Amino acid sequence: MAAGDGDVKLSTLGSGGERGGDGSPGGAGATAARSSWVAALLATGGEMLLNVALVALVLLGAYRLWVRWGRRGLCSGPGAGEESPAATLPRMKKRDFSLEQLRQYDGARTPRILLAVNGKVFDVTKGSKFYGPAGPYGIFAGRDASRGLATFCLDKDALRDEYDDLSDLNAVQMESVREWEMQFKEKYDYVGRLLKPGEEPSEYTDEEDTKDHSKQD
């Protein structure tokens, strides 16, 4: 046998000594690597669980603070404990109004607030924060709001001192007026009609009045 062959066999045997017990190369190193990987995984998992626990504690603390102070703040906000004008007024009986009569119900001269849309008069007192003297739509209180709503105008130019028949509005604007009328019917009490000049008011019975209020409720 040549010396070179012997060297090769010895070298092969020597390298075989580095095999693991299962015959795989580098058994001890692989085991150590696996151990390190498992340890790292456990450490990462532990950190994640710790973070989740900390977040849960923070959320729990925030919830307890809200339960203790948040609700109290909501109940003691502006106007809390004070009854709205609508809560202190009896329900208005159905009747018809002239322009002059309607103007009395502007939230300043009387606590009740009325406005007209498309010839219908609505009691909007419960929406006083919108239609009261200081509200964003207070200009419509005690007035015919039809033209202003149809043209999206909140200026005095949208108001008429005389009866407004809306005859100069186009089809789109009139459709807008009708849509506003339906929305007011759904949300507020319909209390009567806005009278045209020379028109006589209708006489409403208690039964008709009760029936109308029942429909709105």
Swiss-Prot record:
InterPro entries: Cyt_B5-like_heme/steroid-bd (IPR001199), Cyt_B5-like_heme/steroid_sf (IPR036400), MAPR/NEUFC/NENF-like (IPR050577). Keywords: Endoplasmic reticulum, Glycoprotein, Lipid-binding, Membrane, Nucleus, Phosphoprotein, Proteoglycan, Receptor, Secreted, Steroid-binding, Transmembrane, Transmembrane helix. GO terms for molecular function: heme binding; heme transmembrane transporter activity; steroid binding. Gene3D superfamilies: Cytochrome b5-like heme/steroid binding domain (3.10.120.10). The modification Phosphotyrosine is found at residue 204. The modification Phosphothreonine is found at residue 205. Residues 96-195 form the Cytochrome b5 heme-binding domain. The chain crosses the membrane at residues 40-62. GO terms for cellular component: endomembrane system; endoplasmic reticulum; extracellular region; glutamatergic synapse; membrane; nuclear envelope; synapse. Residues 200-209 have a biased composition (Acidic residues). Glycans are attached at residue 15. SMART domains: Cyt-b5. Non-classical progesterone receptors involved in extranuclear signaling are classified in 2 groups: the class II progestin and adipoQ receptor (PAQR) family (also called mPRs) (PAQR5, PAQR6, PAQR7, PAQR8 and PAQR9) and the b5-like heme/steroid-binding protein family (also called MAPRs) (PGRMC1, PGRMC2, NENF and CYB5D2). The cytochrome b5 heme-binding domain lacks the conserved iron-binding His residues at positions 131 and 155. Required for the maintenance of uterine histoarchitecture and normal female reproductive lifespan. May serve as a universal non-classical progesterone receptor in the uterus. Intracellular heme chaperone required for delivery of labile, or signaling heme, to the nucleus. Plays a role in adipocyte function and systemic glucose homeostasis. In brown fat, which has a high demand for heme, delivery of labile heme in the nucleus regulates the activity of heme-responsive transcriptional repressors such as NR1D1 and BACH1. Interacts with PGRMC1. Interacts with AAAS. Belongs to the cytochrome b5 family. MAPR subfamily. This is Membrane-associated progesterone receptor component 2. The lineage of its organism: Eukaryota, Metazoa, Chordata, Craniata, Vertebrata. The gene is Pgrmc2.
